[in-house]
């Protein structure tokens, strides 16, 4: 494999696309056309390395690959960075785009521009990337290339007159696209003679090499004899190995030079030592300033994860630590619940991220887990003028100590076919949304901009959005600010005891209907006991809804044949006394379905 190329012959580019617009398939085509992987090793979605990515057909972890291509007798190096398309993983997109000079904007010829695509294009434009529009799936019978080109021009303002038309599935137009990448995307800029400055844009854990950093060399060069300074931590490390990225194997190299992309092994035990967005430089001759403008990923949604087998708490800790090695956005701390025992409060980027992590914990580490209802972080202003940040409903102070509660809001952009506009606006109003803008992109598609409370979108908003628009709407959001709201804590009491794992923070106007739905569902799920069980929903000390599970009766008079009625009465009275005593000291075991039911109730 050819390794070095002059900087003018390097092209660093990424692919921006919405889920399902054919991004990973196009990446496979480019890899195949450049012969980076032999036909025998080539398989579909070669850039998606996790089983869960292949099953769901989505990209979660951004991957990179180095391709060699000859054009007009010259050898070029094309560094392709595949990015995730789902809204939860937009932090992966933003850091990948920082290390590129250009991006392919891939749009499905049958669907047009989607909300997430617009968000990622704006990140690319902020980074001054050259954007090449690519219309994919042109071989489908319902493809409408001209309309989609017009759609891109109207929505994003990029000239699409000469946009490449391809079919990744049928391998049409791939050669032209590679040549367009070479002629249109600029070569990297940087000073070869300056001190080393390298941006870490991804990191992961390798069982043999430890924590690895995927870097873009901005200035200078790095070799295997060098000592490296990690500017964020101030620690120095020797270089154990340098590699070029390839989905199937790492290709060793003696050095990485200005403009190149590569993998650096420093023999570290954890990715926290090489945080994404940090700068690597030469320990003896450091660069004066680190690379600017990088924000660490912040969790957006929090949930409790508890092992069903309570003795597997330490196994869960080990599993979370292992996943954290590859996922710098995942953070967790131990917590305990009266109902569920010991577990962890885990921060996620969004609901898909939460689902993926839970599924990976169960699949890769054979854990049986239960997740509590997801929540966001609330800003609670207390009467003594102090401020407390609450992410767990059980931490909310008593009502008489609270001056006001502020909840985080997001700005949501939704693109929908106009026939579903009525249903969608009704859903947004139910979710306490405030309309900011409505814009017709063309005769059949509308773009809505709403501000919404974050806790309204973390439960089931995405599912409801898809069902009220038959799956045609696309959705993207960005956090904006905290706003004051009328929020209360809704508790569920079973046999008089508050079940802390079922508590939720909710809008005051929705508390009654949510409480009523909760107790009705719990009545169906909790098995009948030998004593009567009251299920209550309460806000503060006020009970707002109640259901009663009748006791199971044992026929204590079965062995009395005829005879005196007082004998039967005596036995029934004795039974009644026993039940009263049972009710006072009896504990109700809650089935796991009761906790899962909370997530399903609207």
UniProtKB/Swiss-Prot annotation:
InterPro entries cross-referenced by the UniProt entry: EF-4, EFG_III/V, EFG_V-like, EFTu-like_2, G_TR_CS, LepA_C_sf, LepA_CTD, LepA_IV
Assigned EC number: 3.6.5.n1
Membrane topology category: Peripheral membrane protein
Listed GO CC annotations: plasma membrane
Localization of this protein: Cell inner membrane
UniProt-listed PROSITE patterns: G_TR_1 (PS00301), G_TR_2 (PS51722)
Protein name: Elongation factor 4
Gene transcribed to yield this protein: lepA
């Amino acid at each position: 494999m050819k390794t070095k190329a002059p900087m003018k012959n390097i092209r660093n580019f990424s692919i921006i696309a919405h889920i399902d617009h054919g991004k990973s398939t196009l990446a496979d085509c480019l890899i195949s056309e450049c012969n980076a992987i032999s036909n025998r090793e080539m398989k579909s979605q070669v850039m998606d390395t996790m089983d869960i990515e292949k099953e769901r057909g989505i990209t979660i972890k951004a991957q990179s690959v180095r391709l060699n291509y000859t054009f007009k007798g010259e050898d070029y190096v094309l560094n392709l960075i595949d990015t995730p398309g789902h809204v939860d993983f937009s932090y992966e997109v933003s850091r990948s785009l920082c290390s590129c000079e250009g991006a392919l904007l891939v749009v499905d010829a049958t669907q047009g521009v989607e909300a997430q695509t617009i968000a990622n294009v704006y990140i690319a434009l902020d980074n001054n990337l050259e954007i090449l529009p690519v219309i994919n799936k042109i071989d489908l019978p319902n493809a409408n290339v001209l309309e989609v080109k017009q759609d891109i021009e109207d929505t994003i303002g990029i000239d699409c007159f000469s946009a490449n038309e391809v079919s990744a599935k049928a391998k049409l137009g791939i050669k032209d696209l590679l040549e367009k990448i070479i002629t249109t995307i600029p070569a990297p800029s940087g000073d070869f003679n300056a001190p080393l400055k390298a941006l870490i844009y991804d990191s992961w854990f390798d069982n043999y090499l430890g924590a690895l950093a995927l870097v873009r060399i901005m200035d200078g060069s790095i070799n295997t004899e060098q000592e490296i300074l990690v500017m964020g931590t101030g620690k120095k490390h020797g270089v154990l190995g340098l590699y070029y990225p390839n989905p199937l194997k790492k290709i060793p190299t003696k050095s990485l030079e200005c403009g190149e992309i590569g993998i650096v092994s420093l023999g570290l035990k954890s990715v926290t030592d090489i945080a994404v967005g940090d700068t690597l430089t030469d320990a003896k001759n450091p660069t004066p300033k680190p690379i600017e403008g990088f924000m660490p990923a912040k969790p957006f949604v929090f949930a409790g994860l508890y092992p069903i087998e309570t003795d597997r708490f330490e196994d869960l800790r080990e599993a979370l630590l292992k996943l954290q090695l590859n996922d710098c956005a995942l953070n967790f701390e131990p917590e305990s619940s009266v109902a569920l025992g010991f577990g962890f409060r885990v921060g996620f980027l969004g609901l898909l991220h939460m689902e993926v992590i839970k599924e990976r914990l169960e699949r890769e580490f054979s854990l049986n887990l239960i997740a509590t209802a997801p929540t966001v972080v609330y800003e609670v202003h207390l009467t003594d003028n102090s401020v407390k940040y609450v992410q767990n409903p059980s931490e909310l102070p008593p009502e008489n100590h609270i001056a006001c509660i502020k909840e985080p809001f997001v700005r949501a952009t939704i693109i929908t076919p106009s026939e579903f506009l009525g249903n969608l606006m009704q859903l947004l109003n139910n979710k306490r949304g405030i309309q900011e803008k409505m814009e017709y992109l063309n005769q059949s598609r509308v773009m809505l901009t709403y501000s919404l409370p974050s806790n309204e979108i973390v439960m089931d908003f995405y599912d409801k959005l898809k069902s009220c628009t038959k799956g045609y709407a696309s959705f993207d959001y960005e956090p904006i600010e905290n706003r004051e709201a009328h929020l209360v804590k809704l508790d569920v009491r079973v046999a008089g005891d508050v079940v802390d794992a079922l508590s939720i923070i909710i809008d005051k106007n929705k508390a009654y209907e949510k409480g009523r739905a909760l107790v009705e569902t719990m009545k169906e799920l909790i098995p009948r006991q030998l004593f009567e069980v009251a299920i209550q929903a309460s806000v503060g000390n006020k009970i707002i809804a109640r259901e009663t599970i009748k006791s199971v009766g044992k026929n204590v008079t079965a062995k009395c044949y005829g005879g005196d009625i007082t004998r039967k009465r005596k036995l029934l009275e004795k039974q009644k006394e026993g039940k009263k005593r049972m009710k006072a000291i009896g504990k109700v075991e809650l089935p796991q379905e009761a906790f899962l039911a909370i997530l399903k109730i609207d």
